[in-house]
Amino acid sequence: MNSNGNVSVSGPNEKIIQNKHNDSKEEKIMPLVTSKEMLLKAQKGGYAVGAFNAENMEMVKAIIQAAEELKAPVMIQTTPSTVKYGTVETYAAIVAAEAAKASVPVCLHLDHGSSFELAMQA
């Protein structure tokens, strides 16, 4: 139980959060998935995965919202200039927070990384 009084129950690809004050409401939480996992499923299923560059939180939210409307997995891409403006940690936290609320798989991808060090940090 966390400080909000919620109980977490883990499943294979998601967590179910049950509010102790209202057991009838459940919220599914989808964590970030790896691009490898996402692309292997797409290859096996015979479908493509959209990958979109997002420069800020509003773009991340809009991309995930569109993916949810289409019931499709989505790859959020960032660039070296975007993570230089903020930080890798900040950008990853934004995407992870939005992915946690999503009903579809979301992964994060560093597009056109400029160095090995940045790729390892990402």
Name each region found by the language model.
Residues 3-5:
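Ser/Thr/Pro/Gly-rich low-complexity, intrinsically disordered segments
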Residues 11-29:
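Short, Lys/Arg-enriched N-terminal segments with co-localized hydrophobic residues
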Residues 29-50:
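N-terminal amphipathic alpha-helix/helix-capping segment at the start of soluble metabolic enzymes
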Residues 37, 59, 82-122:
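N-terminal active-site wall of soluble small-molecule enzyme domains
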Residues 42, 67, 121-122:
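Generic structural signal for hydrophobic
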Residues 48-53, 74-77, 106-111:
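Hydrophobic faces of well-ordered beta-strands that scaffold small-molecule active sites
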Residues 51, 72-89:
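Glycine-rich, proline-tolerant flexible connector loops at the mouths of alpha/beta enzymes
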